[in-house]
Amino acid sequence: MDKKCVLITGVCGLLGSRLSDWVSENKKDYDIIGIDNLFGGYLDNISKDVIFYNRDLAEDKIDDIFEKHDIEYVFHFAAYAAEGLSPFMRMFNWKNNSVSTANIINCCITHNVKRLVYTSSMSVYGHGDLKLNRFDENDTPCPIDPYGISKYACEMDIKVAGDQHNLDWCIIRPHNIYGEKQNIWDKYRNVLGIWMYQILHNEPMLIYGDGEQSRAFTYVGDNLECLWNAAVLPQASKQIINLGGITPYTINDAANILAEIAGYNKIEHREPRHEVKWAVPTYQKSIDILGFKDTTSLKDGLTSMWEWAKNIKDRPRYKWENYEITKGIYSYWK
């Protein structure tokens, strides 16, 4: 164990693979250790610089990885981020989020990791304070789906580990991240990626409900240095920080921007699903502590991602064969 290391879980997904690229380019004095079960990520997303372990954090022990490598910082990104699907896959959701996080917490405590950076979710806010226009870190979380509940439970567990075992942590609440290396073949999550798949396969771009839901989309490249800062800056210690784009768009607006970029005109509305109407977090704390800069407009970010999507190899689209429950499931998922 000669060289200091960072560990990234979910390393083959969007955020993990892109952060591993950033660390490889900008922090050459660190080795990059990556863990992924390859359920929603792809091995060809990562470079050969990553020391990769194919492990399932919900099932497998990982102490041997910590014993083999001098891991200073852990970025825990591994999760299955499908809020709308989670009411129909509660057990899977809980294992992949809460059980895997407990595994990581135990290892961070046992092996004296300097800091754990955990990506939670804006889903912990639920509907938020309907009198306000944005979710603030000081708001009391009130999630409305099993995914948000599990992410909030993980936050609380990490805080307890900090209080009882002196584990240093920073909790990031990212929102609506998109960009190159995103899984566009999963029909249950990542609306911008779903639309790109639909365009590439000459299917209508589907909007659930009236499309007036508000979201602040985040180009992944704008977040990477901030995530590193969450691990290393003293002022980020034991902070909860929203991280992402500052400009709200309706789903209709986002669909129209992408349709214009792709030269596409098939957009259809389907039955609404159980989700919050507006989800736009505050951002000042990320600027003050992490140095966040919202530099990429939605149009520019989608243009870049679309050029990437047109030129990557196609993959089979993922569909759940067996939901845990089917009562009340949406017609477009049957």
Please report, for each region that a protein language model flagged, where it lies by residue:
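Hydrophobic alpha-helix immediately C-terminal to the catalytic Tyr-X-X-X-Lys motif of short-chain
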Residues: 153, 157, 161, 191, ...
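Conserved sequence/active-site signature of Rossmann-fold short-chain dehydrogenase/reductase
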Residues: 124-125, 177-179, 223
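Active-site loop immediately N-terminal to the catalytic Tyr-X3-Lys motif
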Residues: 90, 184-185
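Structural element of the ATP-grasp superfamily
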Residues: 104, 158, 195, 286-287
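A conserved pocket-lining segment of Rossmann-fold NAD(P)-dependent short-chain dehydrogenase/reductase
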Residues: 86, 139-140, 171-183, 194-218, ...
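C-terminal substrate-binding subdomain of Rossmann-fold SDR/epimerase-dehydratase oxidoreductases
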Residues: 200-334
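N-terminal Rossmann-like NAD(P)+-binding domain of SDR-like oxidoreductases, especially those catalyzing
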Residues: 1-174, 333
